[in-house]
């Protein structure tokens, strides 16, 4: 089944006839493959590993190099990520580049007119399925350099660590209160192999490595910008660790003494429990004997019942009015 956005694009198949096409942004289906007979070449650029790993020939990366007759961009709720990717695409495209931008109204696609107005002509050409479709023609190329998009921050809790982050990464500009509470439970009793799952900019794994130098740190995420941020946070703070893409446990190698996470529960603009459900239900298969799963979550979320089902019991290591840190042992 194709997405609402792709259903709207199906109403405009003449745009694709005989053209090389680049799909980018928040694409989540196999619509590009259905165009194989119409288009001499199709490229897909995604920064989301949960999509990239399920499709063939997807370029999963922070930066993309390549051109096409037509670019199709799927708008997402993450405005910083959208701007970052669109500026990249415009900077390397030729004058006159044709771009279709499609997105759900609730994700803010209407703001594309203001976003792209400085760079060319944009017009809305369709409205259906609660989506808007826009046609853009490039007239004024922007300048793009990755180094200009890095943000950094420090925090008293982080003991002189500097956190590096790219656009679209969770808590990119400051330490969030949930992670801060989770960090308050980290002490020198932690040892062995540690997995920071859903690592974002690498705050948790880097902090553990700083406090417990002998810990073996692995950090994973589904977001290309998060992985690049975590690598830079480690390297700029002279810390060592593995960083790679995994959709929860899809690509996890080996077992761990501690799996620690501030797991996401927002998917775009919807609340989604898939990732944290997989984390809790599958963690025991990735923990060593007596290994621990430790997560922070909003206090209202129904995780205690899930933890009991799969680990018999749990402890609350720290809590505030909004967050709780849960711990279970294998």
Swiss-Prot record:
Assembly notes: Monomer.
The protein's name in its UniProt record: Ribosomal RNA small subunit methyltransferase C
Alphabetized InterPro entries for the sequence: DNA_methylase_N6_adenine_CS, Mtase_sm_N, rRNA_ssu_MeTfrase_C, RsmC/RlmG, SAM-dependent_MTases_sf, Small_mtfrase_dom
Keyword vocabulary terms for this entry: Cytoplasm, Methyltransferase, rRNA processing, S-adenosyl-L-methionine, Transferase
GO cellular component terms attached to this protein's record: cytoplasm
Domain of life: Bacteria
Places the protein is found: Cytoplasm
